[in-house]
């Protein structure tokens, strides 16, 4: 894996954090691979396919629970799996405002993201996060 590959994946993780904050489809959906069975596992459940991940997880769960959310990725490591696949591992924390009470809230945990190369670009294929 080249340094430009690593840097592109690191930028992808930053873009993912930004997309969680904005919750806009135009920020979130282009991050994901096309023609693959994308998935997301979290304490909130298991979600399959980019549209379901966006609609049911990001908007339906995260957006419904928090008036504001900042996802903070810390100590991101990129590990190659094959020439066209890599894993990003990191600790995360959230800084949120609960929609129901207006109170600050946050969680922390570990996240694993699987990235695949498509057309020379690194795209997200799978996310697994766990709360600590």
Regions inferred by a protein language model and the residue ranges of each:
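Short helix-adjacent coil turns
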Residues: 16, 23-26
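Amphipathic alpha-helical repeat scaffolds
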Residues: 10-18
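A solvent-exposed, acidic/Ser-Thr-rich amphipathic alpha-helical stretch
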Residues: 4-8, 25-84, 90-91, 105-106
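Short beta-strand segments enriched in hydrophobic/aromatic residues
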Residues: 32-33, 92-94, 128-131
């Amino acid at each position: 894996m080249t340094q430009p590959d690593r840097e592109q994946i690191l930028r992808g993780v930053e873009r993912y954090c930004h997309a969680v904050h904005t919750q806009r489809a135009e920020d979130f959906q282009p991050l994901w691979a096309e023609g693959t069975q994308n998935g997301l596992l979290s304490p909130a459940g298991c979600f399959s396919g980019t549209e379901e991940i966006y609609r049911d997880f990001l908007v339906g769960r995260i957006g419904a629970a928090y008036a504001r959310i900042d996802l903070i990725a810390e100590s991101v490591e990129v590990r190659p799996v094959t020439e066209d696949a890599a894993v990003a591992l990191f600790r995360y924390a959230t800084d949120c405002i609960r929609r129901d009470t207006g109170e600050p809230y946050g969680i922390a945990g570990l996240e694993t993201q699987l990235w695949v190369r498509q057309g020379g670009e690194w795209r997200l294929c799978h996310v697994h996060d766990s709360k600590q």
